[in-house]
Amino acid sequence: LERTRSLAHQYYSCYPFLSQICALWLNHFTLAEDPEKRREVLSDICDLCEHIKKHCKNISIYNDMTPIQSVAFLQLGRTQDVIDLLEDSCNPVKLSADSHKSLLLSQAYLLSGNIEKADSILQISMYDNILSLLGNAANYLAIHVNDLTVCEQTIARIGKLIEAYHLPGLHPNNTASFEYQAAICYLAHNKKEEALTHAANFVTCLSTLFTDWQILLHGDDYFTKIEPWFAMLDNGAAAPRSKSLVLQDIAKSFDYPAFTVLQGDPAFEKLKRKLKELTQ
């Protein structure tokens, strides 16, 4: 940490580098030895993001800092700061306008005769929107966990999306998160069999995720034009956190109190063993 702080101070006007420092700190602040140290790192992230946004003229870097700063604020419990930062940019009019940018850009490429580029833009947009829907649906389950009707409707609809777009193979990480939350929802209503089904789906997704030594974003036989886009991201196709750190978090998945009611169930104990094998 002190080494990266020193580098941040040394290159205080190199905003692309500072943005990477912010991302690095955010993805690893949990490694700090105590809660106070973690809060200190999060505060440093907020301050450095603010510095970058104040002085950097590169709009892409500026925009990248907003979600990083928002996550740091949330971790610090500064919810009003998150609202102040994001509320205007997330109003329905602006969200609708953003969703049309890819459509307009693809049409422009198509009309100029660049079909290949139009194809790529639309694939990237569809992929991004599908993952956004999947992530939002997991959060939607979390806030409606006490409403079984809403939960079951959401699980049924997103289940069709997962099947149609082969999401356990395309993006097992986000799919695992949804399956995990679905299991928790069913446990909240004492529906153990349904919970076990989704817990099993969760473990299956993790098995796919950790097949290779490195976690990489990738396309498939439908999304054939998105991998060059991954290469343009700051971390390329690689995950922002190392596999070992992800495994540490995953190992504790079934320690969540909601799963206590399944302790001793043969099917659940089998899933726990599979999870343990994955994380060793």
Residue ranges and their predicted role:
Residues 13-18, 57-67, 93-104, 127-140, ...:
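Generic helix N-cap/helix-start motif at coil->alpha-helix transitions
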Residues 5-12, 50-58, 85-97, 122-132, ...:
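Solenoid-like repeat scaffolds
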Residues 133-143, 148-265, 269-270, 274-280:
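Alpha-helical protein-protein interaction modules
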Residues 24, 28-31, 72, 104-108, ...:
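Residue-level signature for tetratricopeptide repeat
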Residues 27-55, 235-244, 253:
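Short coil/linker segments at helix-helix boundaries
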Residues 1-36:
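Flexible inter-repeat linkers and adjacent short helices
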Residues 27, 31-32, 75, 205-208, ...:
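Alpha-solenoid helical repeat scaffolds
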Residues 1-4, 34-50, 71-87, 107-119, ...:
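Helix-turn-helix repeat elements of alpha-solenoid scaffolds
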